[in-house]
Each structure stands twice: as C-alpha cells, then as structure tokens.
C-alpha cells in the first residue's frame, strides 16, 4: 500500500522500512500550500537531520523554507539558540533591501517593515503598560527592532503618546501619557486629517512637522 500523504510518514518510512539513517535524510520543501515551515519542522521532529532553507524564503514558485524561520523553529524545539546571533537576521534583511534592492513584503514575519508595527490604539496602550501584553517576544532584544506604531485614525491617544515617546527617545520619568496637552493636540490634529478624507497612515515627516508647530522647544529633541 502507498504511504499516506504525510511528511511524518515519509521520514518514518525511510528510516524504519528502508533503513536510511537519520544523518542521510534532509528535507527540501517549498511553500505551495503555506506549509513550508510546518513540513520542515515535522521532518526534523521525525528524524531528518537537516532541512534546506534559503534567505528570506526566496526560491522557485512560492519560495523555499525561510532560513530565518527555521532559526526560531530550532530555538523553540531545542530550547536554545546554541550561540546563534538572531540580530543578524535584521542585518541580512537590510542588506537585501538596501544593497540588492529586493522588495520584502511588509507583513513578512521577522523581517518585514510592518511585522511588529501596530496602528491600533488598544495595542499601543498595551505596549505602554507592558510590552509583553502585545508582543509575543522581545523584538528589540532578539532582532534589534523595537515594536513600534504607525499613526492613523485608529491610533487614539495611546498610539500618539507611544509614537512620541519612542521617536524622541523619552526615558521613564519624562515619557508623555494620554493626558499630555501635546498628545491631546496631536490626536485632535490627526483626527481632523481623517475627517477631511485622508486614507493613508501619517508619515513621520508630517508628524514631526506638526510637533514643531505645536511645541518648537520639544521638537528640538528629535
């Protein structure tokens, strides 16, 4: 009888029915059904000693298994990074973008420009109180990319406050909260933009310019 359609079954069968040792088994997968990482992880778990990967998952058709994804799969399965420096993942992504000109989709896990960005005020409020409320891991420590916010009509006072605190590098004791006059004034201005028909997120340049208009002395910090 044919083996079931199963990565686990294939790896198990090769080892136990064909006597192929683990060290001779490696998995080469693509992402045609959004199962690239799941299949590669399953191959590891069932005895394949290696999985083939490519940086950023670049490959034929839907791409190969992303190397950066399997770094974190390895850590989650083994409980250790075994000396791997995960901040290099961000450096690799920056090189691909800035030197090669490769366009990384913004929502790509770990390396996309929006992977740890929120526009929702309720999320920003959580970030202000305790980053672990919103982020599943410390993106600053692990990838040298702190969680951040973009300002839109859903950002609210919390989103504006978080953006100002992060953009201007305010430390504990000097951070602005939702009651700050500057935060309130900025939020009212943002709301007006969307009431007037704006559809896109606010840019950093626009926000900084408005802060210069509202609080010139404060704006000098950034």
Place the predicted regions along the sequence by residue:
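C-terminal helical cap(s) of enzyme catalytic domains, especially alpha/beta-barrels
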Residues: 59-85, 89
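Glycine-rich phosphate-binding active-site loops on the catalytic face of alpha/beta enzymes
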Residues: 46-66
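Active-site-adjacent beta->alpha loops and helix N-cap segments on the catalytic face
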Residues: 1-15, 61-69
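Alpha-helix-loop-beta-strand connector modules within alpha/beta enzyme cores
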Residues: 7-26, 72, 78
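Catalytic cores of alpha/beta
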Residues: 33-48, 65
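A mid-to-C-terminal "edge-of-domain" accessory segment
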Residues: 79-222
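Hydrophobic faces of well-ordered beta-strands that scaffold small-molecule active sites
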Residues: 23-29, 51-53, 70
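Conserved, mostly hydrophobic/aromatic
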Residues: 47, 70, 164
């Amino acid at each position: 009888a044919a083996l079931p359609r199963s990565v686990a079954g294939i790896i198990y069968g090769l080892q136990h029915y064909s006597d192929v040792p683990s060290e001779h088994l490696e998995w080469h997968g693509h992402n045609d059904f959004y199962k690239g990482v799941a299949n590669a992880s399953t191959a590891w778990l069932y005895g394949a000693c290696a999985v083939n990967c490519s940086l950023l998952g670049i490959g034929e058709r839907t791409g190969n298994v992303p190397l950066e994804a399997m770094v974190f799969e390895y850590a989650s399965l083994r409980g250790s990074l075994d000396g791997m420096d995960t901040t290099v993942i961000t450096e690799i992504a920056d090189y691909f973008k800035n030197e090669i000109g490769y366009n990384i989709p913004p929502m790509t896990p770990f390396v996309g420009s929006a992977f740890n960005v929120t526009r929702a005020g309720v999320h920003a409020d959580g970030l202000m109180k305790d980053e672990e409320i919103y982020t599943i891991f410390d993106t600053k420590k692990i990838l040298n990319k702190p969680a951040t916010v973009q300002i839109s009509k859903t950002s609210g006072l919390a989103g504006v406050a978080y953006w100002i605190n992060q953009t201007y590098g305010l430390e504990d004791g000097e951070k602005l909260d939702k009651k700050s006059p500057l935060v309130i004034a900025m939020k009212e201005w943002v709301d007006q933009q969307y009431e007037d028909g704006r559809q896109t997120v606010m840019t950093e340049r626009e926000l900084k310019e408005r802060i210069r208009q509202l609080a010139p002395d404060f704006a000098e910090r950034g």
